[in-house]
Amino acid sequence: MYRLEQEFNRQGLTLSRQTMANWLLWLYRTSGCAKQAIVLYEYQPTRKAEHAEAFLKGFSGWLHADGYQGYHKLPGNIRVVGCWAHARRKFDEALQTLPKEMQKDAPAAIGECYCSRLFKLEQAFAELTPEERYEKRLEQEKPVLDALLSWANDMQARTAPKSALGKAIHYLQEQWPYLTRYLEDGRLELSNNRAERSIKPFVMGRKNWLFANTPGGAQASSVIYSLIETAKENGLDPYRYLLWVLRNAPGLSETDEAWAEKLLPANAPEECYMPHK
């Protein structure tokens, strides 16, 4: 990136490394209740909401997401579901600003405890049907949510807005309509962790592919990783799957618009799957 910056400077064009690196990878994936898991990565130059709106055109339903405000500008037929892992993390960050001997009885510990209680209840409901989970959430989690909001509203008046705890409380209150939306349907999840796990391969190895020389290269990488991660999510061995694709792709006609669909993970033969233990 440094060499590119210097080369542009020699050509009389000022283009900083920060500008050149200002590219983002968007992730879209199916929920845990989907019969066929799909993981899609899309390269875009910015994080503007218009990219998500274009990608989700024609979609109607729930969208699990973090607290990014851009998602709240999406059409009304897309209902954003907030992430309790992010909310809990805010309280944990507030705790970490305190000496260890003060953390146990700190207000931030109370907020984190409320959030953790929700996750423990979700673990207990994991094997239930969506209909059963919906009922149990209203019965056991709704009271926890009501108590948490009451506590947060009370603490807001006694907490400096710019403090770490103040920011955690503000995030909770601002995101409340989205954080509680998971109560609407038993198929919805408490957090966005499923998507976080899908983006982890890029976070762990981003230095290895930091230098995508062109937008076209970044887009091509997005397609390849979409195929690989979707294959893994569906129990396929990535190596066996790619080997099958490369062996069969040359024999398909590119004039047939459906030729690529035949090579998707959903259509892979049994030989591509991981061996059962």
Give the positions of each predicted feature.
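Catalytic center-proximal scaffold of phosphoryl-transfer enzymes
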Residues: 1-277
